[in-house]
């Protein structure tokens, strides 16, 4: 299972919705893959980030950090070759990352 497949599986485990993957090789100098996922509340967004980080560590994937824990309307988890954006619906609609990377 690739890292992208692993991440999507773990986000699905905690009922993440509207999960999309973008191959951003050649478009981004910091990563190869971007995954965006929606959570219904700050609690769910935090839980998905916590679970993803814990499961990645268990599986031997290195985590390079996270941002956004303070507000939990948008948490970014850096897995090196894959960056994961876990967002509440309002934040996702406001920032429209899909338009940026599609």
What spans do the regions from the language model cover?
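Positively charged, small/polar-rich N-terminal and surface patches that mediate targeting and assembly
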Residues: 1-34, 38-102
């Amino acid at each position: 299972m690739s890292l992208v497949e692993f991440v999507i599986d773990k986000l699905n485990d905690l009922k993440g919705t509207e999960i999309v993957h973008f191959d951003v090789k050649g478009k981004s100098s910091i990563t190869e893959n971007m995954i965006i996922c929606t959570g219904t509340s700050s609690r769910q967004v935090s839980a998905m980030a916590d679970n993803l980080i814990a499961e990645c560590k268990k599986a031997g994937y290195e985590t390079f950090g996270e941002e956004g824990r303070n507000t939990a309307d948008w948490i970014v988890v850096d897995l090196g070759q894959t960056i994961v954006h876990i967002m509440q619906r309002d934040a996702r609609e406001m920032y429209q990352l899909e338009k940026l990377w599609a």
